[in-house]
Amino acid sequence: MRMKDLYAPTLKETPSDVETVSHEYLLRGGFIRKVAAGIYTYLPLGRRVLLKIENIVREEMNRIGAQEILMPILQPAELWKQSGRWDDYGPEMMKLKDRHERDFTLGPTHEEIVTDLVKNELRSYKQLPLTLYQIANKYRDEIRPRFGLLRAREFIMKDAYSFHASWESLDETYEEFKKAYSRIMERLGVRYMIIEAETGAIGGNASHEFVVPAKIGETNVLFCEKCGYQASDEKAEYRGEYTQEQEKEKTLEKVPTPGVKTIEEVSKFLGVSPSKIVKSLLYKGREGYVMVLIRGDLELNEAKLKAHLKDQSLRMATPEEILKDFGVPVGFIGPIGVDVKKVADHSVRGLKNFVVGGMEEDTHYVNANHPRDFKVDEWYDLRTMVEGDPCPVCGEPLKATKGIELGHIFKLGTKYSEAMKAYFMDENGEMKPFIMGCYGWGVSRTMAAVVEHFHDENGMIWPLSIAPYTVVVDILNMNDAEQKQVGEKIYQVLSEKGEEVVLDDREVSPGFKFKDADLIGFPIRINVGRSLKEGVVELKKRYSKELVKVNIKNGFGTLLETLEKMKREYDPKEAAR
């Protein structure tokens, strides 16, 4: 490809709405263009990277025996209603009606479609196990699309689904996917973590995420340096002990707290520690209101709450709903005298004489105790784990980091097959529900994650495996006939050798070419410039300052050998060392 013909419009200035390095460089480098919030067009360079990522993923899927299909983006509501997720999935689901007023969704995922497919085709245990996958566009109506490709409304994903006659068979396939995803990460050349994760709206009873460490990552990871435990903060369990306070129960008293709503304000006003205050949070779900109680110095983990109550539709009640249904402003909600289901974090169990909202504006109760003053219906671990909390395996203090989720695998069990009546006949002639797994990989977000992982102040540093082109040949003076001739010859030789090469034959300054080459992130640059008078061209790795001089007076043999050596040694991780 000649640079003068390549549609790669680079930008000198950073667009105003950019929030991350990957968003900036992919826009400035001419890889993507924004259409609307969370919606992008992929330009030729971006498309080449995407195809390489897709091919790596496809090769690893095929390697473990998965078979590729392609399912429709437009999905009928009836299938989602069968599984119970039409209402549960949440506002991220893009819903629409056709001209006949029938409900559809633009698929955020395809469990329902694939389950409906196989239930009409697979009849016997002899046809199992089976794994199907696709690489296709997905849609989610993100409340705030951000970070470019990392949180988009339209994105490209590989989703796979496996069907089994036994849990042992599912376990085997699950482990095969773990290995396949690890190989994908290794081929991308990035550092990664495999962490225990919450299943969320997908459901199931086990889940792992494949995460690339990054400061702007939206997955909070807790890990133990001693035993190797790794989990998302949504999944990490608190197994430490809470103090059982021994003080005598005091008389319950309602006290005025004018304008005092937050934990910090209540703590200061009443002169008590936040750990002696119990937060009362009202949520709404399928079965109406539920009040959640947790110690004031801790944060509620919504993922744990939804998992324990088996209700993904749970959301925090709005101030307007609370005022209308309970007659009290937010900030003064409490568990005493309120007829709603109450669930509490274990941190509340051992407290004595604590503070709760007074269920009346500008009031709180002091010296509250349970079960004397109110009843807790269910107790769970509902706290969000943070750095320094004890490891649930060995008890050592946990460390924290952030990461970008690229892969997510789930043991679904029979959640979908039972709901959608998808059965097979086992070896005893009995009808059994399929045992299922599902396995997602974010293809388009992989592009952004790699840029977040490998870049410097000048631009992107692509690993060889997914670079749009491996080599750029820069003719530094297009008015120099010898430079043009040699540059063209090198370009021709490399092309004939099967190298993915770009010839920068634009009538621009050498500095302009160097800046574009660094911004775009070509792994290896060959300079054809002034040193050609001595029969020398220069080779340079993207992340290195070293120029390797190669004499070409006697042909291109040494040049080709040097290029091959550079490719073998090429490692973007060196940029961070």
UniProtKB/Swiss-Prot annotation:
This is Proline--tRNA ligase. One of its GO terms (biological process) is prolyl-tRNA aminoacylation. PANTHER family: MITOCHONDRIAL RIBOSOME PROTEIN L39/PROLYL-TRNA LIGASE FAMILY MEMBER (PTHR42753), PROLINE--TRNA LIGASE (PTHR42753:SF2). Its EC number is 6.1.1.15. GO terms for molecular function: aminoacyl-tRNA deacylase activity; ATP binding; proline-tRNA ligase activity. Pfam families: HGTP_anticodon, tRNA-synt_2b, tRNA_edit. Belongs to the class-II aminoacyl-tRNA synthetase family. ProS type 1 subfamily. The keyword Transmembrane helix does not apply. Homodimer. It comes from Thermotoga petrophila (strain ATCC BAA-488 / DSM 13995 / JCM 10881 / RKU-1). PROSITE patterns: AA_TRNA_LIGASE_II. Keywords: Aminoacyl-tRNA synthetase, ATP-binding, Cytoplasm, Ligase, Nucleotide-binding, Protein biosynthesis. It catalyses: tRNA(Pro) + L-proline + ATP = L-prolyl-tRNA(Pro) + AMP + diphosphate. The keyword Aminoacyl-tRNA synthetase applies. Consists of three domains: the N-terminal catalytic domain, the editing domain and the C-terminal anticodon-binding domain. CDD domains: ProRS-INS, ProRS_anticodon_short, ProRS_core_prok. Gene3D superfamilies: Anticodon-binding domain, Bira Bifunctional Protein, Domain 2.
